[in-house]
């Protein structure tokens, strides 16, 4: 007997449609101004570091697609109790990463690339485990792409060099992250 569910079909369609709409105008419609500014700075950092506009656009687009898809899964109550526990673990680890990133920026010369790399890698691994039963291999690739890109030790070192070319971008990102933490969004 064929199992058909209009709810499942609607969710798949929603994920598919939203994944194709990860343009800047759509992002601004779906997220708040602070998050949009952070994404813009992440794009600038990626572009400056890689020297490749296309790669910078791709990594931010992948980030948006992943966030949207996980949001759709959450909104449609697709996660089991075990997965919701993983989601809480991810949220805690992400919060820890955000607070560490802010601290490293606020107190110059405290940056430790091994710590940041480990936090980002842990976030990636928890997120992959969370969505392993729900997303495609292509989405797993997007998750790896985003986290591997931003956990690159050279990128992190350039980013956290006080007075370096990426320092103003980092300052804007940390100001935005601070605002999101204060608002209880992170």
Swiss-Prot record:
Q: What Gene Ontology terms for biological process does this UniProt record contain?
A: innate immune response; regulation of apoptotic process
Signal sequence, renumbered to the chain: none
Is-annotated flag, keyword Thylakoid?
A: no
Q: Which Pfam families match?
A: DUF758 (PF05527)
Q: Does the keyword Signal apply?
A: no
Cite a GO CC annotation.
cytoplasm
TM region positions: none
**InterPro entries to which the protein is assigned, alphabetical:** TNFAIP8-like (IPR008477), TNFAIP8_sf (IPR038355)
Keywords of the record: Immunity, Innate immunity
Domain remark in the UniProt entry: The central region was initially thought to constitute a DED (death effector) domain. However, 3D-structure data reveal a previously uncharacterized fold that is different from the predicted fold of a DED (death effector) domain. It consists of a large, hydrophobic central cavity that is poised for cofactor binding.
Q: Which family does it belong to?
A: Belongs to the TNFAIP8 family. TNFAIP8L2 subfamily.
Role according to the record: Acts as a negative regulator of innate and adaptive immunity by maintaining immune homeostasis. Negative regulator of Toll-like receptor and T-cell receptor function. Prevents hyperresponsiveness of the immune system and maintains immune homeostasis. Inhibits jun/ap1 and NF-kappa-B activation. Promotes Fas-induced apoptosis.
Name of the protein: Tumor necrosis factor alpha-induced protein 8-like protein 2
Organism encoding this protein? Salmo salar
The root-end lineage is: Eukaryota, Metazoa, Chordata, Craniata, Vertebrata
């Amino acid at each position: 007997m064929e199992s058909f569910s209009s709810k499942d079909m609607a969710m798949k369609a929603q994920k598919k449609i939203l994944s194709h709409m990860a343009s800047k105008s759509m992002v601004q419609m779906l997220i708040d101004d602070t998050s949009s500014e952070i994404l813009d700075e992440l794009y600038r950092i990626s572009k400056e570091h890689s020297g490749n506009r296309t790669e910078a656009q791709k990594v931010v687009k992948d980030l948006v697609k992943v966030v949207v898809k996980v949001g759709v899964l959450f909104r449609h109550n697709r996660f089991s109790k075990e997965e919701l526990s993983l989601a809480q673990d991810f949220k805690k680890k992400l919060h820890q990463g955000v607070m560490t990133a802010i601290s490293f920026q606020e107190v110059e010369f405290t940056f430790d690339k091994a710590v940041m790399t480990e936090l980002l890698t842990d976030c990636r691994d928890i997120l992959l485990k969370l969505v392993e039963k729900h997303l495609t291999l292509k989405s797993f690739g997007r998750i790896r792409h985003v986290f591997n890109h931003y956990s690159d030790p050279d990128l992190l070192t350039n980013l956290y060099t006080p007075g370096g070319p990426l320092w103003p971008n980092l300052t804007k990102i940390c100001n935005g992250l601070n605002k999101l933490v204060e608002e209880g969004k992170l």
